[in-house]
């Protein structure tokens, strides 16, 4: 979309736009209206010139929109929170419907702050575990603890009877050393965890209470004041069983992930349905749902798996405020949230009075639900819940981590929510496994969403192309009267064109008098913009909205000229919404007041009664593109200029067809700018001076250089590394001449603080950009980022034989190797691995590879990397080998290591798996091996070169003798025939001398061969060519058919005679060798022609056909002839070289196989002989 295409949203002062609702069964539920109004999205005036800042503008507008929505919702959430709190204090009940209809009152900053603090620092936990907060220093001082800590740890006075020989249990008190609460071995584990950089990757620790040795899962995370330790009682006394349980949970998750990955693409519904089935199977909850958050922040249940006797919630929509923004923020931090029993009394957290604010429980697995959430759950019959965030990437491959460790590119797409009708608590390892499953779901979903977006873009582009086509053939009314029509461009219930005072409606639309009223309102209230979109005409301030009723609620309009308009209409949302849940019964008197899914749905329908589905950004972009196309069509007509697309009775005058084509191109060009902008590959363009005039979002992201900064910079001088300068200059000069090169690698600089001095490698295709008169006006580069592949070589070292022998071999070519036992513990870590990571064998063996070795010791880039690694290890243990899996981590010193991981199953003799064996492919080891291979190749080459040098040297002497003998014969008296034979012999000798000079072939390969041109007789050339084939023809008893006109024999030409001879002789001899010996023949046909050049000179064209009957050349020789690098036959090498020489002389060759014969077709262009004065070696 062209830059500046969306105006600042306009809001009618009176319009209080209720947010479309959301219904959720977790976290803090509040209900309300959102302030806001219709969004007036105006299409901007300008087209999308080179590089178009268009998408940047769109993306920014979208981002700004979502931020403003979130901020508005924070205000509402805070106000509702206050209402709920007051209702409790005053003894009244919280009235759902009343709160929804209450007029919005602005919340003060203190109110919002208090609300956030109450949610994040509520001071209570759930009673199924206990919480400690410990100072993050050597003292391990207790800063806070939950009131149930002493009981759960068996440290209350009534748990033990003091005796003379045993010390009294340590008290759980502020300031006490937390290590004393646990067994000595557990204290050591805690100390080690506190020393780790990424403390949470070690979760869960298996620790025991000091007095009773009761086992706990300890889940640790760092906060502003220290480390929070959540202790959840473990169900078994044996740590081995606990580890087995954790590994089993991971295996189940990996199995589910593998099934997700095996699903056919292009079906998001199937993906969501599969996820709910797997989660229910893994966790055993009564109901599992996928919630999706829509663009306007309201939510919908899109998939469900439930116990048969439960009411279905599939298709339910609920208000945005059902899941407050604060909760959504928390889900990005803490992606899995369990409430074990909503009826359980929360436990208070006692904390050090010296702490400035209540303890932050954001990351705690035990944080108590807020009162209104517990009430909501109880109302809907859900006693326990498990909620998991579904996070997708909102753009960009590399996660740039922002504050709080959250990637700025991450977006909360929705939630997977589990409900149970009785208390339910699932152990931490299983929740952790579910988190992995969610990450895999997010990755898969992201791919599906991108695919869906591309398909929708393609559909829109196809429709736009067809609409353009109509505009060019007919009057503009064709876009409403024919198929496809403007209704096919975006999802709508009706559309209309108002053109030259006439109304052309389609589908569900206002009447003509109503449309005139709307146009008058647009002129008065929105006359200064170029369009408007709203999901509620009533909220937008249109007074006639009530008369339109439910049929027309939403409208998008594009102004073409001050008096011509395009409209799209949508009916109210409710008709789109289907829910299989129970309807509201009149006898449920309190149904509207209680917080319940049915009330949420009812509230949602109430809010959207006079509202349509919102217009999405992509839809507005499509409308805007069509607006620009039409504006071009109408503008000249309105001005009445001579080059207009003036429309006379629906027919366009023929003389204007060409200009119409130009206008169509400019429109399509604008649309192309939008597609280039949103492309996922780097695209950039330069003008004829080599300065940037196009720079899409992907290249901006890769280089760290924004569109604005890149524009006008010199590609060669400012943006590439010195080593690429020559390549790029050559690329540019060739493309500006119309010669387009493909697959050229260039090295671009990166910009911005973190990226300075970095480089990205891009393989580009250069395309000449032309204007409508076909003049080249610049160069466009379409690229592919290969930076990752560049770091790692392509080939793997194939390793066979005994593991131990390989692992402990000191040979530097042995790659870094590590191994896993069946429980994912590290069982091997070789010397190369120690060198690569900086961690010694003793430090890592026995530790978990997932989360501990790779995660805590060797940090990974983001949680998705850990999920992918987990899938590889578990599958390898289970018997599925992986090859060349891209794997990156930070070593002990923080250096980023990129590698390829190969993982194989380790088996006993009986085939039973005992773990996985992994090795990393690092560029340096690969390069060493490549050098070794290169050295061996060089040795071979040197031996060949010696042989070749010997032949070239020794052949010169007899050639010299032949030349001398020829010169003696020339001085004797010869008749014409004898003189002809002598000239043919001399021509063959000179051809041979040239070939000997070519021994290295380098000049032919790189195109630098110097052609020695002079005037020559074509008759001499043909005699020399035929003479070289005569012996073989006689030997094989083949008939030679010559079809050479006399004018060819007498013709003169200008070029390199002996090269032409060499090439023609080689192709002819190939035919002689391939002809069948029984009744065989070979035909030589030559035809002359003359081609006139644009500068007035003539070029002679010679067309040769060398044919023989039957199958002709063997397939491998033909393949070799057209190959540039790999040959399997000697004859093929010769033909390939001749093909290249022919190309250097401006000729070309084709090999054609017909049913009864095969032939070479050779076309050679030669200039006519120059005047004598000009002749020289060129």
From Swiss-Prot:
Keyword Transcription regulation: yes
Gene3D superfamilies named in the record: 1.10.287.130, 3.30.450.270, 3.30.450.40, Histidine kinase-like ATPase, C-terminal domain, PAS domain
SUPFAM superfamilies attached to this UniProt entry: ATPase domain of HSP90 chaperone/DNA topoisomerase II/histidine kinase, GAF domain-like, Homodimeric domain of signal transducing histidine kinase, PYP-like sensor domain (PAS domain)
Presence of the UniProt keyword Hydrolase in the record: no
InterPro entries assigned to the protein according to its UniProt record, in alphabetical order: GAF, GAF-like_dom_sf, HATPase_C_sf, His_kinase_dom, HisK_dim/P_dom, HisK_dim/P_sf, PAS, PAS-like_dom_sf
Record keywords: Chromophore, Photoreceptor protein, Phytochrome signaling pathway, Receptor, Repeat, Sensory transduction, Transcription, Transcription regulation
Residue ranges occupied by any PAS domain in the UniProt entry: 668-739, 802-873
TM region positions: none
Source organism superkingdom: Eukaryota
Assembly with partners or alone: Homodimer.
Functional description taken from the UniProt entry: Regulatory photoreceptor which exists in two forms that are reversibly interconvertible by light: the Pr form that absorbs maximally in the red region of the spectrum and the Pfr form that absorbs maximally in the far-red region. Photoconversion of Pr to Pfr induces an array of morphogenic responses, whereas reconversion of Pfr to Pr cancels the induction of those responses. Pfr controls the expression of a number of nuclear genes including those encoding the small subunit of ribulose-bisphosphate carboxylase, chlorophyll A/B binding protein, protochlorophyllide reductase, rRNA, etc.
Name under which the protein is recorded: Phytochrome B
Organism expressing this protein natively: Sorghum bicolor (Sorghum)
């Amino acid at each position: 979309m062209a830059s500046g295409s969306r105006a600042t949203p306009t809001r009618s002062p009176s319009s209080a736009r209720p947010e479309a609702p959301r219904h959720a069964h977790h976290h803090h539920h509040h209900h309300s209206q959102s302030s806001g109004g219709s969004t007036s999205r105006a299409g901007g005036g300008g087209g999308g010139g080179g590089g178009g800042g268009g998408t940047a503008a769109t993306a920014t507008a979208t981002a700004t929109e979502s931020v403003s929505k979130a901020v508005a919702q924070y205000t509402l959430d805070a106000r509702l929170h206050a209402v709920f709190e007051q209702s409790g204090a005053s003894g009244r009940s919280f009235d759902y419907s009343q709160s929804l209809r209450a007029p919005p009152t602005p919340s003060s900053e203190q109110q919002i702050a208090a609300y956030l603090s109450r949610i994040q620092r509520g001071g209570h936990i759930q009673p199924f575990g206990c919480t400690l907060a410990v100072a993050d220093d050597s003292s391990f001082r207790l800063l806070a603890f939950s009131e149930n800590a002493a009981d759960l740890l068996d440290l209350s006075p009534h748990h033990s009877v003091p005796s003379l020989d045993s010390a009294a249990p340590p008290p759980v008190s502020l300031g006490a050393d937390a290590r004393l609460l646990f067994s000595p071995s557990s204290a050591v584990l805690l100390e080690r965890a506190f020393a780790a950089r990424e403390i949470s990757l070690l979760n869960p620790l298996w620790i025991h209470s000091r007095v009773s040795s009761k086992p706990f899962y300890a889940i640790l995370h760092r906060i502003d004041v220290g480390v929070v330790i959540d202790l959840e009682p473990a169900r078994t006394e044996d740590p081995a069983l606990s580890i087995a349980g954790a590994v089993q949970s991971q295996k189940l998750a990996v199995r589910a992930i593998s099934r997700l990955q095996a699903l056919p693409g292009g079906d998001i519904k199937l993906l969501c349905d599969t996820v709910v089935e797997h989660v229910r199977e893994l966790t055993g909850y009564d109901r599992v749902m996928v919630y999706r958050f829509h663009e306007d922040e309201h939510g919908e249940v899109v998939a469900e798996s439930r116990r048969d006797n439960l009411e279905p919630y599939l298709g339910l929509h609920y208000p945005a405020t059902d899941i407050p923004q604060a909760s959504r923020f928390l889900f990005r931090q803490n992606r899995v949230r369990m409430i074990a029993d909503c009826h359980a009394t929360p436990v208070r957290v006692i904390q050090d009075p010296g702490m400035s604010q209540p303890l932050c429980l954001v990351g705690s697995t035990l944080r108590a639900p807020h009162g209104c959430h517990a009430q909501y759950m109880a109302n809907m019959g859900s006693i326990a819940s498990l909620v998991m965030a579904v996070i997708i990437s909102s753009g960009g491959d590399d996660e740039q981590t922002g504050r709080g460790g959250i990637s700025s590119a991450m977006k909360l797409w929705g939630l997977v929510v589990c409900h149970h009708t009785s208390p339910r608590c699932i152990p931490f390892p299983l929740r952790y496994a579910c988190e992995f499953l969610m990450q895999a779901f997010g990755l898969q979903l992201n791919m599906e969403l991108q695919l869906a977006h591309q398909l929708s873009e393609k559909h829109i582009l196809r429709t736009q192309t067809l609409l353009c086509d109509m505009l060019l053939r007919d009057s503009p009314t064709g876009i409403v009267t024919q198929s496809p029509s403007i209704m096919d461009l975006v999802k709508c219930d009706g559309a209309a064109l108002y053109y030259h005072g006439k109304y052309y409606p389609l589908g569900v639309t206002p009447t003509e008098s109503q449309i005139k009223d709307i146009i008058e309102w647009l002129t008065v209230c929105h006359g200064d913009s170029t369009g408007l979109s709203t999901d509620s005409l009533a909220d937008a301030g249109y007074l006639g909205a009530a008369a339109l009723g439910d049929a027309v609620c939403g409208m998008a309009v594009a102004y073409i000229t001050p008096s011509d308009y395009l409209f799209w209409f949508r009916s109210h949302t409710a008709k789109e919404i289907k829910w299989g849940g129970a309807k509201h019964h009149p006898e449920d008197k309190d149904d509207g007041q209680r917080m319940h899914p049915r009330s949420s749905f009812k509230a949602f329908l109430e809010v959207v009664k006079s509202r349509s589905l919102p217009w999405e950004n992509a839809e507005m972009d499509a409308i805007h593109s069509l607006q620009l196309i039409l504006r071009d069509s109408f503008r000249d007509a309105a001005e009445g200029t001579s080059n207009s697309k003036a429309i006379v009775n629906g027919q366009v005058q023929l003389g204007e067809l060409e200009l119409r084509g130009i206008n169509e191109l400019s429109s399509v060009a604008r649309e192309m700018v939008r597609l280039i902008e949103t492309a996922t590959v780097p695209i950039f363009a330069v003008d004829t001076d080599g300065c940037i005039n196009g720079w899409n979002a992907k290249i901006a992201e890769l280089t760290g250089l924004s569109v604005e900064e890149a524009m006008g910079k010199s590609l060669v001088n400012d943006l590439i590394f010195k080593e690429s300068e020559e390549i790029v200059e050559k690329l540019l000069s060739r493309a500006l001449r119309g010669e387009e090169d493909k697959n050229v690698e260039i090295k671009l600089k990166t910009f911005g603080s973190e990226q300075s001095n970095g480089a990205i490698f891009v393989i580009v295709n250069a395309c000449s950009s032309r204007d409508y008169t076909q003049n080249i006006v610049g160069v466009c580069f379409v690229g592919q980022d290969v930076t990752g592949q560049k770091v790692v070589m392509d080939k793997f070292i194939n390793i066979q034989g005994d593991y131990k022998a390989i692992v402990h071999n000191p040979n530097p070519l042995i790659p870094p190797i590590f191994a896993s036992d069946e429980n994912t513990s590290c069982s091997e870590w070789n010397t190369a691995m120690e060198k690569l990571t900086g961690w010694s064998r003793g430090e890592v063996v026995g530790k978990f590879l997932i989360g501990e070795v790779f995660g805590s010791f060797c940090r990974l880039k983001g949680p998705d990397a850990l999920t992918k690694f987990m899938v590889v290890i578990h599958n390898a243990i289970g018997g599925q080998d992986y090859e060349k899996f891209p794997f990156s981590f930070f070593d002990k010193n923080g250096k980023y290591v990129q590698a390829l991981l190969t993982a194989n199953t380790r088996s006993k003799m009986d085939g039973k798996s005992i773990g996985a064996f992994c090795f990393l492919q690092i560029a340096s080891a690969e390069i060493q091996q490549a050098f070794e291979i290169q050295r061996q190749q060089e040795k071979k080459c040197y031996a060949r070169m010696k042989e070749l040098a010997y032949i070239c040297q020794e052949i010169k002497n007899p050639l010299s003798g032949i030349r001398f003998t020829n010169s003696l014969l020339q001085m004797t008296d010869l008749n014409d025939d004898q003189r002809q034979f002598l000239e043919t012999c001399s021509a063959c000798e000179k051809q041979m001398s040239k070939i000997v000079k070519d021994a290295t072939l380098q000049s032919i390969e790189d195109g630098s061969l110097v052609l020695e041109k002079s005037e020559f007789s074509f008759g001499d050339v043909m005699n020399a060519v035929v003479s070289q084939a005569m012996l073989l023809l006689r030997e094989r008893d083949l008939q030679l058919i010559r079809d050479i006109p006399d004018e060819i024999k007498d013709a003169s030409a200008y070029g390199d005679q002996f090269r032409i001879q060499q090439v023609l002789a080689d192709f002819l001899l190939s035919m002689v060798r391939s002809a069948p010996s029984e009744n065989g023949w070979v035909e030589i046909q030559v035809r002359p022609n003359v081609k006139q050049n644009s500068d007035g000179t003539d070029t002679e064209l010679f067309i040769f056909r060398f044919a023989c009957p039957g199958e002709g050349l063997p397939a491998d020789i033909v393949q070799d002839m057209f190959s540039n690098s790999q040959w399997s036959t000697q004859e093929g090498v010769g033909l390939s070289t001749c093909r290249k020489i022919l190309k250097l002389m401006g000729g070309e060759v084709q090999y054609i196989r017909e049913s009864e014969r095969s032939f070479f077709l050779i076309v050679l262009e030669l200039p006519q002989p120059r005047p004598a004065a000009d002749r020289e070696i060129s």
